[in-house]
Amino acid sequence: MTAHDVSADIEAVVEDTELPRRLKDEVYSTIEERGVGVDDADRIAKAVETRYLDTRVDPLDPVGTVSAQSIGEPGTQMTMNTFHYAGVAEIDVTQGLPRLIELVDARKTPDTPMMTVHLDEEYATDRERAHEVVWKIEATRILALGDISTNVADMLVEIDLNEDTLLERWPTVNDTDAIAEEIAETIESNLGVSTRQAGTLIEFGPEEPSYRDLLQLVEELREIVFKGIEEITRVVIRKEETDNGEEFVLYTEGSDFGEVLDIEGVDASRTTCNNIHEIYRELGVEAARETLINETMNTLEEQGLDDVNVRHLMLVADIMTNEGTIESIGRHGISGSKDSVLARAAFEVTVNHLLDAAIHGEVDELDGVTENVIVGKPIKLGTGDVNLRMGTTQD
């Protein structure tokens, strides 16, 4: 019995088709919505079944070649612009062909890493609460907190902290002296110096009076992260319309997926980043595969190429994640690890592959497309893998 409110005759008609359960449920929903009879239900079910069977891949169909054509041809129309104004103020992200190459090459770090951070309900609708999360994520360095000066006469670095900025960046602390003390302790632990603090003024210097050492301390001071995540240099907050209504969404320059997910107020179920390897490390290969598909599809859609069937992208993502890790499509990944000597040699560094194969006594079984084309044999796809036997008798 189905959960849908249809007659037994209609259920028998639909269940008699070769449709998968998801499509059967959609047929039931359509029949319920339109209130059709058995005859119309039969016609609907058979029409859907016909379309479904037509879309299935035929035996020996070269799905890899079709996917390569379906992605490669639109790729010729993509722009070479590395940066694109992605609808978010002041956040540049790699788009177009450079981004597509990044994805199929499975680069460890994107040219412009970024994250889209969604917030929990109590933070998503309150700008002040959302800013609390911003300051926990964005790397806060000394130049954002006050003025730095050097006292050459006394060989000291002097930091004059801005009280308003301190209270803004540490919204849960009301005492600026306590914040300044925390900053002084961070300086001591990172630079190995002794500090003197008076209110929001902090002083320190090198152990031995040296102008060179003084300037070196200033340079090292600029790199210290006093709050937030070091890899994330900037966060932009934006109010957007989502499935849950209007809410504040954060966009970051730089990414550290694991660290951000641990921050209070971040909705881990909806937060994403454009670094496939970070998602793989935190959530596993299935999440990485899904992100690979979504990122590739979004890249094509940004260029107006949204007519590429997602199944071609799914096939590429499946191949890249088939071994449980993320492999690139190239000589250091899938193409370079094929069993066929000729297929490897045809891709890149031909002489090296042939020499290595000869040294190790490798044998090419000529099972794939490339190697059969090279030696002039019919490829084992389509009619090339169908054998006819004439005059045989069947027992």
Swiss-Prot record:
Gene Ontology terms for molecular function = DNA binding; DNA-directed RNA polymerase activity
- Nucleotide-binding listed as a keyword: no
Q: List the disulfide bonds.
A: none
Where does the source fall among the domains of life? Archaea
* EC number(s) given by UniProt: 2.7.7.6
Q: Which biological process terms from the Gene Ontology are attached to this UniProt entry?
A: DNA-templated transcription
Q: What does this protein do?
A: DNA-dependent RNA polymerase (RNAP) catalyzes the transcription of DNA into RNA using the four ribonucleoside triphosphates as substrates. Forms part of the jaw domain.
The family annotation for this protein states: Belongs to the RNA polymerase beta' chain family.
Q: What is this protein called?
A: DNA-directed RNA polymerase subunit Rpo1C
Q: State the species of origin.
A: Haloarcula marismortui (strain ATCC 43049 / DSM 3752 / JCM 8966 / VKM B-1809)
Which gene produces this protein?
Answer: rpo1C
